[in-house]
Amino acid sequence: MKKKLVVLGSTGSIGTQTLEVLSHLEDQWEILALSANKSTGLIEKQARKFKPRYLVMMNERAALELKHRLSDMSSEVLSGMEGLITISSLEEADLVINALVGAVGLKPTVAALQSGNTLGLANKESLVIGGEIIKSYLNEEGRVLPVDSEHNAIFQLLNGHNDKEVERLILTASGGPFLELPRERFKDVSVKDALKHPNWDMGGKITIDSATLMNKGLEVIEAHYLFRQPYHNINVVVHPESIIHSMVEFVDKSVIAEMGSADMRMPIQYVLTYPRKVKSLAKRLDLTELGYLTFKKPDTVKFPALKLAYEAGQQGGTMPVVLNAANEIAVSAFMNEKITFDKIPVVIERVMENHQIISSPDLEDVIEVDNWARARAKEVTGQC
């Protein structure tokens, strides 16, 4: 009997690659539900191929259009956050993959976990802003399976080990497209240039985050919650080749690394086949062809977003909520050419400076602070 899969954000980068992997594993999985924002054309193609029982469009108008397009099919079309929560909570789901981008992913994450579903988490913002709310679920083995390549690597490396055996986690960062670009030229960076990631095929927002190193900062906070490690035990190393996805140093000072080609289909597949490994679509890694691997310390003067993320995580409470919300607004402003690339961390820092931390937030607190930070960030971007 095939297992049933729900994919939130099926038209995005992780979502489309998930469906590609699922086609490779079609003897094991079937699609129960898919969701998208407003890409009706692509989700129609996905619906006709995978024949899900449910489809969700965040955009109400797009939902109406999709209903019309699929009038010859039996799939039920839902809309909005209510629709996302509904499909995240389906009892018959064997796995819910949250591949949404941004804070919109939090409520579906909470819904999936509260309903008892296993969660494949690519939406790092769920943990960044909601870590205090959902951390109790993270202690249940196999309930949250990380999709991010770095956290998926650590998840595999820690298999068979307990927290007391871990000395530190080492997250690798490519350094993005501007690793060697002088800081004084950041103000001249174009959106087109920032969207050219040297190694990974990702969506627009996460590619910009990679260019500022904010993506790695968000991943540090995510790792803190996923693996129950204090921030001083989570290090970042710049590794331009993106061959080593992460490392773990144990108390005996041995270091184990997870390596492979820069292909998101590998961690996605592991989430779908956990705890087994099967043949994948990824290219075999040939180290002799590569020839060398390089490493360097991240420059937090040149890339202050990483430092801001550490500060937000260490301050805790609602500060990571502010960090994430301000970053989303600043990145959007840059992508719409309202601010220059170098102003992204400036906006974030100014909003963080104005925040009064709530130390033990509930879901309502998180939503309220998220809204406040977005409004404040929009004000700040208008002043830059």
Swiss-Prot record:
Residues annotated to bind NADPH: 11-14, 38, 123, 125, 203
Leader sequence residues: none
Catalytic reaction list: 2-C-methyl-D-erythritol 4-phosphate + NADP(+) = 1-deoxy-D-xylulose 5-phosphate + NADPH + H(+)
Highest taxon of source: Bacteria
Associated pathway: Isoprenoid biosynthesis; isopentenyl diphosphate biosynthesis via DXP pathway; isopentenyl diphosphate from 1-deoxy-D-xylulose 5-phosphate: step 1/6
The keyword Transport appears for this protein: no
Name of the featured protein: 1-deoxy-D-xylulose 5-phosphate reductoisomerase
